[in-house]
Every structure is written in structure tokens, then in C-alpha cells.
Amino acid sequence: MRPWTGSWRWIMLILFAWGTLLFYIGGHLVRDNDHPDHSSRELSKILAKLERLKQQNEDLRRMAESLRIPEGPIDQGPASGRIRALEEQLVKAKEQIENYKKQTRNGLGKDHEILRRRIENGAKELWFFLQSELKKLKNLEGNELQRHADEFLSDLGHHERSIMTDLYYLSQTDGAGDWREKEAKDLTELVQRRITYLQNPKDCSKAKKLVCNINKGCGYGCQLHHVVYCFMIAYGTQRTLILESHNWRYATGGWETVFRPVSETCTDRSGVYTGHWSGEIKDKNVQVVELPIVDSLHPRPPYLPLAVPEDLADRLVRVHGDPAVWWVSQFVKYLIRPQPWLEKEIEEATKKLGFKHPVIGVHVRRTDKVGTEAAFHPIEEYMVHVEEHFQLLARRMQVDKKRVYLATDDPSLLKEAKTKYPHYEFISDNSISWSAGLHNRYTENSLRGVILDIHFLSQADFLVCTFSSQVCRVAYEIMQTLHPDASANFHSLDDIYYFGGQNAHNQIAIYPHEPRTADEIPMEPGDIIGVAGNHWDGYSKGVNRKLGRTGLYPSYKVREKIETVKVPHVPEAEK
């Protein structure tokens, strides 16, 4: 008998045991259906564990296949190393079995159930309060009505903050916060590996390429989003992005003088065949494809926002409140890796400004946006939401000072804000405001300023701005890369989040709605609603695609429709 035969039987025994483990867990998942009051969060964690176990089972199978060595001793060489790896996997499996047994035996933690009941009670008490106070308002007039309405809104705010605080703590109980941290980190590392692999082909002369010119006729935030759009198409079509940035309006030396190159091995656009974008299928045999701006893109591929990769969608839905934003943020993260001089600038600015937490970021865009793409918003509109969020933060952390990082292209606003709100500490660099003016916009000093503003806005605990501004949306996107889920860490005074040139943003009705006014539209569960915007008053505006009717509908009666797309990737990128 050959020496490897015994080892092979031993390996088969391990695989059999592993399969038994998967069957055991699967059985538990089925039996858990008899207890519908189990937390959906608990089920998500178990499913995530099962997915990891399946992956490890597949790893073991591949390792076992590789151990089919026809001859030679097994106590040395590659086979020996693989067997030791199998032993380590087995130890990990035993640990996971024990952890799972403890979890299923103990059920949900005490803190989880206490918080769940507190939230349930808080919702009931809020309803009782609303009914009572609104009945009182019916019988009041004049100054008494105004006084009672003000008290009513103040008390309502306390109720809302109480429930939101309990929800925050609930999201952290029973290891959920730790799981979310790890899952977000794992997903980010996976995507960054895939991007890095695609951007660094072994042979640039043979690589399929997509060429993108940075000089779109707009500002920094718009140009960055233009490159992100190019990058997402390159990723979806499995091409290496070639970024042409020589004579960039902001820095004539090009992108690489500010940020790290998008590729270490392939920056040359040359190839056998070159052509303009004609669609993924028609361009299949074209080595180098030039991409137009998104406004002129035809045909439109499915890789545009707000789609996310099909193979990541389930994990993203569990870990993040807005998977589409998270996916966009991964390309922003890769693109804006700073050169050493910029890193130093950011560090020095952080010390000079005294930037520290807690802090809320406020971005006020004036100049060219007002009257064209956005309405004028006084500082008071922003500060209402700043104060509300500081009151919420104070329920779970020590707020020594109410700090606000103020980014604006209006140099007079800092003085106005300090005068009107003396109890706040405003952190701002007025030289950046001056450089953001139209007459100074396309300079290296202006570029430095907008990069610093975006950096500090993204670092804030909460963001108040107008999503009609590209700078604000870039800051929000970067914020997603700094936390497991920062999807709710903002308030926009105008638009909901969008990506310029995106495909349709759809929602799905989960409750029926009968219109009460001519401005509203009817809905039935399952109807697809194309959302145009949120009015931030409990209602959104959109079109019922089944009926073709446009109007208002209650925002709580819909959920986001997650669009997925198959994106190919090579196994080598997973390593």
C-alpha cells in the first residue's frame, strides 16, 4: 500500500465530519422556524456563520484534492504543510462548533431583550403622547396654542432621541457591533483586492483597457465622480482603467502628483485595436476602449450605480443601510489614496485646526450653485439639525464642546456663524473659502482646499449639507469607508443621495396607500415606485411605474429595491 493512502482516508474522515457539522447547523436553522419570535439579527448572524463554514468546507475539499500525491513520504514537502493546515482548520472548526452550541443554547442575550422591550414600550408611549397632545391642541388658540405647540415639539424630540439611542445600543448587543466591524472590514479588503488585481495586469501590452480623460468641464467633486463612473464600467467589463490626467485643470502634472497612480504596472493606453464605447458585447474584441462622459454614454451598461455586484449583495444588505453608496465608496477609496506630501498636509491641518471629536460637519455651498442647481439655505437651517444631533450624541457620549467643522465657499459665513451661535466652536479655514471662489477655483491651492474640506467633513460624526453638491456627496461616500455603516449619518437639506448619470432609483411598496389629496398616488404592496426625492416631511415624491402616475406617498410605506448585477472576477484576485 502506498504511504499516502492512509492520509487520504483520514482526510475523507475529516470531510465527512465537516459535512455532518453543516447538516447539524442546517437542521438547527430549519427547527428555528418553529420559533418565529427569534430575532432576525440572530438569524443573519447564523447564516453568515454558515456561509463561512461552507467556504471552509470548499477550502478543505480543494486541499484534499491537492494531497493526492502518487508517491513519496508525507512527513515532508508540500503534503506535510497541507496536512498541518488541515489540522489547524479542524481546530478552528471545533471552536466554531462550541461557539455555535453556546449561542443556540443561551439564545438572545439579556441586554438585547431589555433593549427590544424598551424600544417597543417607547413606540407605544410615543403614540399615546401624540394622541393626547394633538387632542389638546384642538382646543387652544392664539399664544396658548403657540406655546403648547413649541412644548409639544420639544417633548416629541425627547421621545425620538430616546428611541434612537435604544436602537443604537441594540445594534451593538450580543456581539452584533463586533460582527458588523469584522464583516465590513472583510468586504472592503475583498473588494480592494479585486480592484488592485484588475488594475495591475502582469502584461500591460495584452491587457484589455478602458481609457478615461479626467478633464470633464466641471469642479473637483464632479470630476472625481466622473473618474469613479469610468472605474465602475472598467471593473464591470473587466478592463484596466487608464486615467488620462496630463494638463489636469487643477494640477497640470496630473492625478499622480496628488494621489497614488491608479496602476503600478499599466498606465500606457496603447493596444492593437482602439475604439469608442459601443457597448460591452460589440467591444468584446477591442483591446482599448475610450469612454465618453456619462451624459453621452450609449448603450448604458448595467454596471452603473445604483447596482451592486450580485455575489456581494446579500452580505452588503446585512451589514450596510445603503449598499449602492457603499459600492461607490470602494472606488472612491481606491482613487484618493494620497501621495506622501498630501498625507503630511492633512496631518498638519488636523493639528493646526484642532480638529477632534465629537464634531459635526456642515457644508454650505453658495456661489455658482445658488439659483441654478440649488436654493439658498441660511445657516439657521443647518444649525437646527446640528443641535438635534448633538442632543442625540449627548445621550451616549460626553460632549465637552459642540464643535462644527464649517466648509463653505462663502468667506463671510464663518463670522456670521460665530456671531449667531457663540456657544459652538466653529472649526474652519477661511483661506479655503476664498480659494473656492469662482475666480480661484481651478488652481492647485483650490484643489488642496477642497481636498482638506472633504477630508474633514468625511471624518465628522454627522454631516449636514445639501446633496445637490458633489463635494457633500463625496464626503458622504468617504464616510462609508471609515465606519461599518454610516448610511444614516447625514441630513440633506435638499436631495436624497444620487450619483450623476445613475440608472433608475426604484423602491418597492410594502404597504397599500389610498390617496387623501390630488397630490398623492395610490400604491399596493409590490408596486415599483421610481423615487424622485424625499420631502423630509414624511412624504416622498415619485412615479408608480405600474400606473404611470406621479405624486406623493408616505416614505415609510416603501423599501429600497436593491439592484444587482453579475460582475465577473478571477479567482486569483481572491487570494
UniProtKB/Swiss-Prot annotation:
Highest taxon of source: Eukaryota
Catalysed reactions listed for this entry: N(4)-{beta-D-GlcNAc-(1->2)-alpha-D-Man-(1->3)-[beta-D-GlcNAc-(1->2)-alpha-D-Man-(1->6)]-beta-D-Man-(1->4)-beta-D-GlcNAc-(1->4)-beta-D-GlcNAc}-L-asparaginyl-[protein] + GDP-beta-L-fucose = an N(4)-{beta-D-GlcNAc-(1->2)-alpha-D-Man-(1->3)-[beta-D-GlcNAc-(1->2)-alpha-D-Man-(1->6)]-beta-D-Man-(1->4)-beta-D-GlcNAc-(1->4)-[alpha-L-Fuc-(1->6)]-beta-D-GlcNAc}-L-asparaginyl-[protein] + GDP + H(+)
Domain SH3 as annotated: residue spans: 502-563
Topological domain ranges for the Lumenal compartment: 31-575
Alphabetical UniProt keywords: Disulfide bond, Glycosyltransferase, Golgi apparatus, Membrane, Phosphoprotein, SH3 domain, SH3-binding, Signal-anchor, Transferase, Transmembrane, Transmembrane helix
EC identifiers of the protein: 2.4.1.68
Gene Ontology process terms (BP): GDP-L-fucose metabolic process; N-glycan fucosylation; protein N-linked glycosylation; protein N-linked glycosylation via asparagine
Disulphide connectivity of cysteines: 204-266, 212-230, 218-222, 465-472
Transmembrane domains' residue ranges: 10-30
Span of the annotated motif SH3-binding: 299-305
Membrane topology, record value: Single-pass type II membrane protein
Protein name listed in UniProt: Alpha-(1,6)-fucosyltransferase
Source organism: Bos taurus (Bovine)
Gene: FUT8
